[in-house]
């Protein structure tokens, strides 16, 4: 857990040297102490979702005394309004800008990690809390559609035991340029998380014109589906997962159409130049 008394003292003693101080995420104590010592200069980026962290009593001061609250999505803003009510500090949806690194050489990357030609991709922390039922759903999909060549590739540090199956491939940690190349060559990108405040991987994948499949039980991910005109499809149970995955797996035209929609969605809403103007 991040906790730095030295940082908090620095903010207290040097706040007059800054026009604004921007603590990111409510998960750690820095957001509380920044608001305590420099409320008039604090712009909070909460990155909150429906989790016990959001209901800490100390956050009442953060969300009512800060100069401004910059949310990532409408769903996040609605959650905060339900918790903190009419006394919440001035706020709006600001979000973040998306900038992508240049990709690594695909032939080298594919050989290094023994990646297949057709795969559904997950990028993030590899643990059961983030993946939910996606292993079971995917393997049942392969049973229903045994002729599918689709594999499941997971990129990220492993925090739980691997699920051993020939159709499931783990890369563990990869470099940023390698990650971009792996996203570029994915057939489908998935985010099965139930808790998100934005989902950078969704925006990165859309910026690279990839079709997305997401957990519709997460309000933030579902919001992206609607706002992007279905550049991402969502599932809510095993049946809808299998149905939506088959749609994507079997239709090149659908994936291309969704890719163009996603690219447009990110350029219109998550361009870094546009986001920076909102903070001025």
Tell me what each language-model feature is.
Residues 70, 113-131, 135-139:
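Conserved donor-binding/catalytic core segment of Leloir-type glycosyltransferases
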Residues 41-52, 59-105, 115, 122:
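Donor nucleotide-sugar binding/catalytic pocket of nucleotide-sugar-dependent glycosyltransferases
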Residues 227-239, 247-252:
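Conserved acidic donor-binding segment of nucleotide-sugar-dependent glycosyltransferases
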Residues 156-181, 188:
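Nucleotide-activated donor-binding/catalytic signature segment of Leloir-type glycosyltransferases, i.e.
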Residues 279-280:
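Conserved small/polar residues in nucleotide/adenosyl-binding loops
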Residues 211-215:
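Short hydrophobic beta-strand element within catalytic cores of glycosyltransferases
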Residues 194:
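Aromatic "clamp/platform" in nucleotide-sugar-dependent glycosyltransferases that forms part
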Residues 247, 254-268:
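A short, well-ordered alpha-helix in the C-terminal region of glycosyltransferases
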């Amino acid at each position: 857990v991040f906790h730095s008394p030295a940082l908090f003292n620095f903010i207290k003693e040097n706040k007059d040297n800054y026009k604004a101080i921007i603590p990111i995420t409510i998960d750690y104590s820095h957001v509380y102490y920044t608001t305590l010592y420099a409320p008039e200069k604090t712009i909070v980026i909460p990155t909150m979702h429906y989790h016990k962290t959001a209901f800490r009593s100390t956050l009442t001061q953060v969300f009512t005394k800060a100069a401004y609250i910059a949310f990532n999505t409408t769903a996040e803003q609605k959650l905060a309004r339900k918790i903190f009510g009419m006394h919440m500090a001035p706020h709006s949806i600001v979000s973040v800008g998306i900038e992508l690194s240049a990709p690594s050489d695909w032939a080298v990357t594919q050989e290094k990690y023994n990646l297949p030609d057709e795969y559904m991709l997950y990028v993030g922390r590899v643990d059961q809390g983030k993946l939910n039922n996606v292993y079971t759903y995917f393997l049942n999909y392969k049973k229903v559609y045994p002729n599918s060549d689709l594999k499941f590739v997971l990129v990220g540090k492993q925090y739980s035991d691997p699920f051993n199956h020939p159709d499931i491939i783990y890369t563990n940690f990869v470099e940023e340029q390698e990650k971009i190349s792996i996203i570029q060559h994915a057939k489908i990108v998935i985010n099965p998380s139930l808790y998100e405040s934005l989902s950078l991987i969704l925006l990165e994948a859309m910026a690279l014109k990839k079709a997305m499949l997401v957990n519709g039980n997460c309000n933030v991910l579902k919001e992206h589906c609607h706002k992007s005109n279905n550049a991402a499809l969502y599932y809510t149970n095993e049946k809808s997962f299998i149905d939506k995955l088959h749609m994507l797996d079997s239709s090149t035209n659908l994936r291309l159409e969704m890719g163009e929609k996603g690219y447009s969605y990110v350029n219109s809403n998550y361009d870094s130049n546009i986001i920076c103007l909102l903070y001025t």
